[in-house]
């Protein structure tokens, strides 16, 4: 298991933008991670004060960070950065609210040079919250 210290070693993100709390499962091309969503998240102050919902774009960012942990934990990529290059087929199916535990899965489906394509999904209580195909570039 990869803990928060390992995650912080791999990713440059820090509070309030670090959106991966723990890695539950990891292999060469697949990763499962979690984010504990609490009422203390800064985005809930404005989205929405009387009905707090995690913004969909931040769910996708959490998925991208999940994939980033996998890629940046590899010896050949240590010290590099991962940059978003695109999102396709993104769907939001369930609202993510305070108290939810977001389970994020990313599977690499294609790599060419410094470009990678990932199928990603986020679930809450076994129900699909969001999914999509993410493309990113690995830079130095």
Curated annotation (Swiss-Prot):
Active site: 47
InterPro entries the UniProt entry points to: FabA_FabZ, FabZ, HotDog_dom_sf
Keyword set, alphabetical order: Cytoplasm, Lipid A biosynthesis, Lipid biosynthesis, Lipid metabolism, Lyase
Recorded catalytic activity of this chain's protein: a (3R)-hydroxyacyl-[ACP] = a (2E)-enoyl-[ACP] + H2O
One BP term from GO: fatty acid biosynthetic process
Gene3D superfamilies from the UniProt entry: Hotdog Thioesterase
CDD domains cross-referenced by the UniProt entry: FabZ
Major localisation: cytoplasm
Keyword field contains Acetylation: no
Cellular localization per UniProt: Cytoplasm
Role this protein plays: Involved in unsaturated fatty acids biosynthesis. Catalyzes the dehydration of short chain beta-hydroxyacyl-ACPs and long chain saturated and unsaturated beta-hydroxyacyl-ACPs.
Name of protein: 3-hydroxyacyl-[acyl-carrier-protein] dehydratase FabZ
Gene giving rise to this polypeptide: fabZ
């Amino acid at each position: 298991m990869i803990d928060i210290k390992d995650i912080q070693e791999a990713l440059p993100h820090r509070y309030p933008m670090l959106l991966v709390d723990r890695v539950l499962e990891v292999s060469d091309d697949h990763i499962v991670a979690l984010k504990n969503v609490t009422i203390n998240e800064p985005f809930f102050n404005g989205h929405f004060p009387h009905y707090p919902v995690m913004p969909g774009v931040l769910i996708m960012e959490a998925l991208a960070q999940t994939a980033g942990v996998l890629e940046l934990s590899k010896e050949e990529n240590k010290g590099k950065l991962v940059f978003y290059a695109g999102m396709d087929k993104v769907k939001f199916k369930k609202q993510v609210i305070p108290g939810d535990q977001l389970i994020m899965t990313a599977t690499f489906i294609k790599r060419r040079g410094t470009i990678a394509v990932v199928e990603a999904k986020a679930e809450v209580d076994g129900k699909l919250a969001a999914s999509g195909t993410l493309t990113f570039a690995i830079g130095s």
